[in-house]
Amino acid sequence: CWNGKKEWLFFMITIWVPKRLVEIDLYNVAAQSPAALAEMSEKSYRQRVAYAAQKIRDSRAKIVMLTGPSASGKTTSAHKVAEALEASGTPAHVISLDNFFKGAQYYPRLPDGTLDYENPDTLDMSLIRQCLSDLSTTGKTVLPIYDFTTESRSSETETLDLKGGVCIVEGIHALNPELTGLVKGDDVYRIYAGLREEYAIDGRRVINTQDIRLCRRTLRDAAARGRSPEKTLAMWDRVLDGETRYIKGFKTTADFLLDTSFTYELGLISRLLGIVRRQFTLEGHNAELWDETARRFEHVVPLDLELLPADSMLREFYGSAVK
C-alpha cells in the first residue's frame, strides 16, 4: 500500500536488498499523484545513500570501492555518498578509475578483433594498487589524469590528501580484488550499486533491471549527445557479456548493496521512449531490440520530466531532456 510510506522506505534501505517485483497497475495508481510518487522515490534514495554513508563511517575504512553495472548510477551515487559523508563531518573524495586507463593503443581485443572496453586490462592495475596503498598508509597519493579527447594519459596529475577522511573509488572494476591487493582488509569497504526493482503484470515480470539500464544508457546518449541509439544498442550485448565476465562475479564480496531504483522513473522512461523512436531511424536487430523494449512500457502511465529535482541522481540520464 502506498500509504505505508515509512514501512516501504525502511524496507528499501536494508543492507542487502533482494529484488522486488512491483505490479504496474500499482505503479499506475501511484502515478495519479505524480509529485508525491516522485518525492517518495527521491526520499527513499536519499535515505539509502545516507545509510551507506553511515555504514562507511561505522567501518572506519579509509577506502571505499564502489562498482555497479552499466547505467546503474554508480558515478553519481559515488558523489552522493561523498556529499553525505561531508555533511556528517567526514572529508570525502571521489576517484574515478577511468583516469587509470592505459590508452586506446593498449586495449585488449575480443576474438572478433573489436576493442574489449570492459576488460580490466584496459586499466593500469599496478598504478592503482600503488595509489591505494599510499592512501592506506599515508593518506596521500598522486593520481593520473586521463585525456579522453586524445585517448591517452595526460602529463598533468592530481595530488590527493585525504586529511583523515575517506576516498570513494568508483568504476566497473572497483570490486576486483587485484586492485586492493596491497591494502589491509580493514581499510577497505565495498559497495555494489544496482537496481533492485522490477515490474510485473498479473505477477508476470515484464520489465527487468536490464531493461531499465538499457533505457537509461540509450536515452542519456540520445538526449545529451544527440547520438542515435544505434551505437548504444549495437554494443549492449557486449556490455552485458563484460558485466558477466568482469563485474558480477565480485558482487557477493560487497559489504553493502546500494539500491539505485526509483519507482517513478518508470513513467519518465515511458514518456521518452516514443520521442526517441520518432527522432531517430533504427534498422534491423537494433530496431527490434528497441521496439521490444518499448512494448514492455505500453501499460505504464507516463510522467512529466519536470518532476525531476535539480539534484536528482536521475539527472545523469534524463537531465538533458528536461526543457
Model-derived regions, located:
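Glycine-rich phosphate-binding loop used to anchor ATP phosphates in small-molecule kinases
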Residues: 58-60, 129-187, 232-250, 265
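Post-Walker A helix-loop "phosphate-sensing" segment adjacent to the P-loop in P-loop NTPases
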Residues: 83-93
